[in-house]
């Protein structure tokens, strides 16, 4: 019996990078699933947007059946792989996607592992935080029912940070696009839960950055699930998108999301980024844009109130590709960071990528208070995260094309975002690929581990680890905890779930059975 290959092949209408992650996040870096401006399939090389969020929905019996047996042990995986080495063997293949969870780290960087397979649809494409209580994993092309590729809507799995996770059934909430819209990239990222309508319950704004509006493909939209005593469901929601003044094809609006009560009126507001959005420039193209959507008693406003744009009026800067909002400098006021992996410091400079920082307590419409830029062509700003090293908080920025393989750059918010070192591969490093995502985890009181994922490293993705102690970063080496033969885009997303664990996405994983 010939093998039956049931792998869904997606036309990734993307923006010039292979995201993986970001998806973020929020995770995020430039995204394989974000359309390139005026193009049907162009991308950078990474993913993500790491954001903070919450969600709620009760699984049906059919969904529970589909999720059954998704947690595959390492031993089972090896056994299944061995069974397929015989050319005459009968087996089936399903593109499930999945995640690895690594726990119980020792001081050497070794850890225990378990993995969870998805129901198709690139589970593990992006992994990100949803505030203090939850973390989420996206399956941006999952279908209802599972593996029915003609009905791919996307799905978001939300887990509690203090709960042990063994399978998708352990999700506190599972959300689908409430309109069951197809191929919209639902769940790519989400904002931290916040009270948008002022009723005392946290609401959840979720990305649907590939959603069409009429003939405008991938214009993007924000789906808000309104909270209740039981969390979120697909019955109470609203959809917001750009107004006619801005909306265009391939905007990818909501590729990045952040929530804060910006104007202090008691209603949380949403900032939504789209790396291809913004007014069309005289020579064609756009800069990228972040739009402000106002919270109110009736829910999130249908359209934007105002927008943020790069200071340099040049196309292809991808402003809004990643975003985070957090108190970075310890003054109890939220700071906003927006990156664009093609930003320019001035009209005459090359597209290096950069990040604009809007300090809390200032009028963000009047411009950024700090700006940082990378080297020419480095795609600096592909992903943004805050990390802790030695108990101190840093802004970490990924430059996917810097120094051949990518670098992670650290900035100190307490010192006006002064550069404080970076992770990079040594000159003798001889792999192919680029960094997709990264995060850190504490090994001991004086040692942190930085985990670097690259979905294109090796034959199916890899993670590399380096210790950080006394402000010194060790030479990176293949992480001791990763599978012997990683595959399926392993390392596309890397995330510390704040439960003493590192979660790694492998969205292209193929399950053989």
Enumerate the language-model features and the residues they cover.
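Sec-dependent signal peptide recognition
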Residues: 3-10
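C-terminal motif of bacterial Sec signal peptides marking the signal peptidase cleavage site
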Residues: 17-18
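Ser/Thr-rich, Pro/Gly/Ala-heavy low-complexity intrinsically disordered linkers and tails
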Residues: 23-90
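Acidic/hydrophobic-patterned starts of short beta strands in beta-sheet-rich repeat architectures
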Residues: 83, 132-138, 198-207, 264-273, ...
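Blade-edge motifs of beta-propeller repeat domains
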Residues: 90-122, 126, 134-135, 146, ...
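Beta-propeller blade termini
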Residues: 125-138, 188-198, 255-264, 321-330, ...
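Short glycine/acidic-enriched loop and turn motifs that connect beta-strands
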Residues: 141-147, 210-215, 276-281, 342-347, ...
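Structural signature of WD-repeat beta-propellers
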Residues: 151, 208, 217, 274, ...
């Amino acid at each position: 019996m010939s093998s039956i290959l049931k792998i869904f092949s997606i036309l990734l209408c993307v923006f010039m990078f292979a995201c993986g992650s970001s998806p973020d996040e929020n995770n995020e870096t430039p995204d394989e699933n974000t359309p390139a401006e005026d193009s049907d399939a162009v991308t950078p090389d990474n993913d993500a947007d790491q954001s903070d969020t919450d969600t709620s929905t009760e699984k049906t019996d059919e969904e529970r059946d589909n999720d059954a047996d998704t947690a595959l042990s390492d031993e089972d995986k090896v056994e299944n792989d061995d069974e397929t080495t015989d050319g005459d063997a009968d087996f089936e293949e399903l593109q499930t996607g999945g995640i690895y969870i690594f726990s119980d780290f020792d001081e050497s960087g070794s850890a225990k592992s378990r993995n969870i397979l998805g129901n198709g649809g690139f589970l593990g494409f992006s992994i990100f935080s949803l505030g203090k209580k939850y973390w989420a994993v996206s399956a941006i092309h999952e279908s209802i029912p599972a593996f029915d590729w003609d009905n791919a809507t996307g799905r978001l799995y939300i887990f509690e940070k203090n709960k042990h996770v063994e399978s998708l059934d352990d999700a506190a909430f599972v959300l689908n696009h409430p309109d069951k819209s197809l191929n919209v990239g639902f769940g790519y990222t989400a904002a931290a839960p916040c009270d948008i309508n002022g009723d005392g319950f946290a609401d959840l704004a979720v990305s649907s950055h590939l959603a069409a509006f009429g003939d405008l493909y991938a214009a993007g939209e924000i789906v808000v699930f309104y909270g209740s005593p039981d969390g979120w469901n697909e019955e109470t929601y609203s959809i917001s998108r750009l107004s006619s003044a801005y909306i265009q094809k391939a905007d990818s609006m909501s590729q990045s999301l952040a929530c804060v009560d910006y104007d202090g009126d008691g209603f949380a507001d949403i900032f939504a980024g789209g790396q291809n959005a913004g007014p069309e420039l005289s020579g064609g193209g756009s800069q990228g844009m972040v739009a402000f959507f106002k919270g109110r008693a009736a829910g999130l406003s249908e359209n934007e109130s105002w927008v943020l744009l790069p200071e340099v009026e040049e196309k292809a800067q991808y402003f809004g590709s990643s975003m985070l909002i957090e108190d970075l400098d310890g003054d109890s006021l939220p700071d906003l960071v927006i990156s664009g992996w093609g930003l320019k410091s001035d009209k005459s400079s090359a597209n290096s990528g950069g990040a604009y920082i809007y300090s809390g307590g200032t009028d963000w419409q009047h411009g950024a208070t700090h700006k940082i830029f990378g080297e020419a062509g480095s795609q600096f700003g592909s992903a943004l995260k805050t990390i802790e090293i030695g108990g101190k908080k840093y802004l970490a920025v990924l430059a996917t094309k810097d120094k051949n393989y990518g670098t992670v750059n650290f900035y100190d918010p307490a010192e006006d975002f002064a550069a404080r070192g970076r992770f990079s591969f040594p000159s003798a490093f001889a792999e192919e690929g680029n960094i997709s995502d990264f995060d850190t985890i504490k090994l001991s009181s004086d040692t942190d581990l930085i985990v670097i994922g690259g979905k294109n490293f090796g034959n199916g993705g890899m993670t590399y680890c380096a210790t950080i102690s006394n402000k010194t970063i060790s030479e990176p080496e293949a992480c001791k905890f990763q599978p012997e033969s990683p595959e399926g885009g392993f390392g596309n997303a890397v995330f510390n779930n704040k439960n003493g664990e590192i979660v790694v996405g492998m969205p292209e994983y193929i399950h053989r059975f």
